[in-house]
Amino acid sequence: MDFTDRWRRTRQAMETGRVDALCLSVGSDLPYLTGYTAMPLERLTMLVFPLDGDPMLVVPELEAPRVETDGHDFVVRPWSETQDPIGIVDAALGDARRVAIGDETWTRFSLALQNVGWQRAWIPASDLMVGVRIVKTPDEVDRLRAAAATVDRVVDAMAGVRWSGRTERDVAREIRDRTLEAGHESMEFAIVASGPNGASP
């Protein structure tokens, strides 16, 4: 995956919003810009994405082998148990005065960064990223159509499956398994609801 256009549009949004740096941790914005999905650990993973210069992915040492840069220009900065990841991120931010931080960043990390970077203004990253991500490239539209078509085929195939005598969880598991077998990389959830209040799971 080539992230060049996404980086360009993100930096345009940062420039328009007068944002010096973007800090992303868990959530969907990180893989959107890097292809890497952070595990929700008690150890900090954070992308420091400056307006100018190469981004840096600060990641626990044990997780570093999972990171694939795909030849893209971001620095992977592993940290060990004896190092301070907040200090590493703070140093990477340098002179940044206005920083957008990921909305899903754990509070303990957000507060720690605000404490050491008290001189900075902190804003939600969604102020930038929603506008960047809402505009789809032709390739992204094609991928969305392909994903939707796959799910449509799975739903059509489920019409011939026995539903009675099964739990909603069991049916949801079958939907998930069929979707993964059809080529999806992941499936976060499937809502299967029946009976009273079934339309409001």
Predicted ranges, named:
Residues 148-159, 168, 175-176:
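Active-site pocket-lining segments that scaffold enzyme catalytic pockets across diverse folds
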Residues 150-156, 164, 181-185:
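Secondary-structure boundary elements
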Residues 1-153:
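A composition/biophysics-driven feature that prefers long, compositionally simple stretches
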Residues 14, 162, 179:
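Hydrophobic pocket-lining residues that define ligand/cofactor binding sites across diverse proteins
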Residues 30-40, 126-130, 135, 166-201:
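Short catalytic-site patches enriched in acidic/histidine residues
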Residues 102, 159-166:
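Conserved short loop/turn motifs at secondary-structure junctions
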